[in-house]
Amino acid sequence: MKLSDEDLSRLNEFWLYCSKNQYFNVGYPESADFDYSELEKFMKFSINNCGDWREESNYKLNSFDFEKDVMRYFSQLFNIPHQESWGYISNGGTEGNLFSCYLARELFPTAYLYYSEETHYSVDKIARLLNIPSRKIPALSNGEIDYQQLVTQIERDQQGNPIIFANIGSTMRGAIDDIGRIQNDLATLGLDRKDYYIHADAALSGMILPFVDQPPPYSFQDGIDSITVSGHKMIGSPIPCGIVLAKQHMVDQISVEVDYISSRDQTISGSRNGHSALFMWTAIKSHSLSDWQSKVKLCLDMADYTVQRLQKAGIEAWRNKNSNTVVFPCPSEPIWRKHSLATSGDVAHIVTMPHLNSTAQLDALIDDVIFDLSPEYGLGHVIGQN
């Protein structure tokens, strides 16, 4: 296997581009704070985690033992006994959401799917793929679902088995839907807890809330039926990945036997990247509880710093509690393109991830936003000037 000099040059140019932009992600919640150099030696192996990690597979080069450790870790993190849960390492949050909605649809074939307008765009695709009737519910100003509108819509639809897609950290505003309130509201409609399904999309905040004081409801102990977390966000990974975790007795209803690999399979994708299990295993084994707490505190402190600087300049910046997503009015296109900011309508956001570990890394961006949105204040108030 040999590349031409021209092709090698192209690869080298791309490596330089990646090196230059490695720590530039401020509009999207990918962490560059990782080091998996110990795993480089495994890159010569085709590691495929096809099927169920609980079962022996006829394909020998799998990392099931590591995947099992990862899933045990997350079952403990999200307060469900390991033996009462099942999940797997996915290709990312969208696959985890797809798996959970598929599971819910199989449990409640006539159900409608309810989610807020702040929910990740993948859910629109999932509803179409699974042919699930769906209702997009308006959101409150902070990004949470409008609880009254949710109840009203379920009542109007006469839905006895609704599927609730809850945001545990919404994409643009980092909003956390109140799982406790949703359950209380559904009880007022006469729905028993066993008659509906709650999925928690915790792509980013799933690795934040377990490490803060007095978090809002987010776990199985709080009433969810499944949860997804991204591996390339707070954890950090060179390859997009994630986990999905659900209740064992529910998953058993969709299991199938696969002769080709001599194993059971409940996953969506079939062949799965076995290297992702090694990345996630290395991350959880190399970080203690206090390490995660420190990492989360750093992110929230940097978010606070960003809010304070923008507010001091008269810019309406804010963040939800326990969120590292800072929301503010959308700057001009040259600014949001320069800094790769995510925008939606009239707002933009900054996501302070672990690799942004000093205010100096944020100041150039903040200065540009201030000059763009509040130019009169910006003159003479740039960091470093008297």
Swiss-Prot record:
Keywords: Decarboxylase, Lyase, Pyridoxal phosphate. It catalyses: L-histidine + H(+) = histamine + CO2. Substrate binds at H120. Its EC number is 4.1.1.22. GO terms for molecular function: histidine decarboxylase activity; pyridoxal phosphate binding. The modification N6-(pyridoxal phosphate)lysine is found at K233. Belongs to the group II decarboxylase family. Homotetramer. This is Histidine decarboxylase. It comes from Vibrio campbellii (strain ATCC BAA-1116). The lineage of its organism: Bacteria, Pseudomonadati, Pseudomonadota, Gammaproteobacteria, Vibrionales.
